Curated annotation (Swiss-Prot):
Segments on the Extracellular side according to the record's topology features: 59-81, 153-176, 241-260, 338-401
Intervals, Cytoplasmic compartment: 1-37, 103-131, 198-219, 282-316
UniProt family annotation: Belongs to the TMEM117 family.
Pfam families linked: TMEM117 (PF15113)
Stretches of the chain forming a coiled coil according to its record: none
Protein name as catalogued: Transmembrane protein 117
Localisation per UniProt entry: Cell membrane
GO cellular component, one term: plasma membrane
Membrane-spanning ranges: 38-58, 82-102, 132-152, 177-197, 220-240, 261-281, 317-337
Protein topology in the membrane: Multi-pass membrane protein
Keyword annotations from UniProtKB, A to Z: Cell membrane, Glycoprotein, Membrane, Transmembrane, Transmembrane helix
């Protein structure tokens, strides 16, 4: 009797394990199905355009600021003093880049990820360039503070201190970010499309499309044609304000801080889902090494000749398709995180804006006047009752909705 009970117990456990495996298998089948992956990748592109159009920060005339990345931008691009200090600044950020690359390659990638954590996705040299990129950002951030400490030696150098403020307006920065996210999202979506049409994990899906896609150079011609045409249109529309979303929308789907915060959160989740839906996630150990977008090769190899008397070898830059495309996703993720932060902690007065009747957000379009306004002056009550002496009209009449 006890033997029969033990047999039934083991049988029940085996059936339970098989049932769980069946559920997991079904979930993965639909979660990683080509239609699911295509839907997520193209929805990210659409949502990024939507949040750029709805985000009031994209109309702000105040100086753009961004944690960490803003310091790096200010350190390399803007706020250059004259004479010796300018040379010192260049030397420091060049040294920061070199230190960041070395630390990323040998400390973070090889020692931390490879030997200590033993992460399979970072085996050999896989993912080293992405690791080196993020370690370089960290290095630039640290060296920018070292540069600030040196500037404290002179009182006249205080205006040149490196901060998170980037020296450009939010309107200009958001346009550049929109173009950057478009490029990253499109290349990623096209990478997913390319992978779906090249692989055979789902042999019954899209047979006709796969047949046409694999003929000759169809995929390469289509990639560059669509990329150049759509990017030209996107850059034209974003940079010239030829199409204004507020004029098209006309309050049909008005948004507020909560809805924009949820939209930004969905974008972040979808960015991660694109990587998680990969058939080789999380180790990326499969034999399939997909072609780079717009190219007929799975990897880029660049030979760097060095002094053979010292190193006795040549160095090779090797970028595989997987890390090239998913590396782009993580770059876009930086901009999406900044967008998410703006929506979560949005305060109109910090961006030269205020709330008017009907919960509409008004933007002060003259950036020079923002220096003279404090928080109490950036309200509808004050701006609708005070006269601008330059125009002899109330301040709110010169502001954009």
């Amino acid at each position: 009797m006890s033997s029969q009970s033990l047999h039934d117990c083991l049988r029940g456990r085996c059936l339970g394990v098989l049932r769980r495996m069946e559920i997991i298998g079904r979930f993965r089948y639909y979660f990683q199905h080509p239609w699911s992956r295509l839907l997520v990748s193209y929805l990210v592109t659409f949502f990024n355009f939507l949040i750029f159009a709805e985000d009031p920060v994209s109309h702000s005339q105040k100086e753009a600021h961004m944690s960490v990345v803003g310091n790096c931008f200010s350190f390399i691009i803007s706020k250059y003093p004259a004479g010796f200090w300018s040379v010192l600044k260049v030397l420091l950020w060049v040294l920061a880049i070199i230190c960041g690359l070395i630390a990323g390659k040998f400390i973070f990638h090889r020692r931390l990820f490879g030997r200590v954590l033993r992460l399979k996705m970072f085996r050999e040299d896989h993912g080293s360039w992405m690791t080196m990129f993020f370690s370089t950002i960290l290095s630039l951030f640290i060296f920018s503070h070292i540069y600030n400490l040196l500037l404290l030696m002179s009182v006249r150098m205080r205006p040149y201190m490196v901060t998170e403020y980037m020296g450009i307006r939010n309107e200009s920065f958001m346009k550049m970010a929109a173009v950057g996210t478009w490029m990253g999202d499109f290349v990623t979506a096209w990478m997913v499309t390319d992978m779906m049409l090249q692989d055979t994990h789902y042999p019954d899906w899209g047979r006709t499309a796969r047949h046409l896609w694999r003929q000759g150079h169809n995929r390469i011609v289509l990639f560059w044609t669509v990329l150049i045409c759509l990017t030209s249109v996107v850059v034209l529309v974003i940079s010239t304000d030829w199409i204004r979303w507020d004029n098209l929308n006309r309050g049909f789907l008005p948004s507020d801080e909560v809805s924009r915060a949820f939209l930004a959160s969905f974008i972040l989740v979808f960015d991660l889902l694109i990587v998680m839906q990969d058939w080789e996630f999380p180790h990326f150990m499969g034999d399939l090494d997909m072609n780079l977008p717009g190219l007929s090769t799975t990897q880029l190899k660049i030979r760097l000749p060095v002094c053979k008397r010292i190193f006795k070898e040549e160095y090779h830059i090797h970028i595989t398709g997987k890390w090239f495309n998913y590396g782009i996703i993580f770059l876009v993720l930086i901009l999406d995180l900044n967008m998410w932060k703006n929506q979560i902690f949005y305060k109109p007065y910090e961006y030269g804006q205020y709330v008017g009747p009907g919960e509409k957000i008004y933007t002060v379009e003259d950036p020079d006047t923002l220096q003279d306004f404090n928080r109490s002056m950036l309200t509808w009550e004050w701006r609708s009752t005070n006269i601008d002496p330059r125009t002899n009209q109330t301040f709110n009449q010169s502001n954009a909705i």
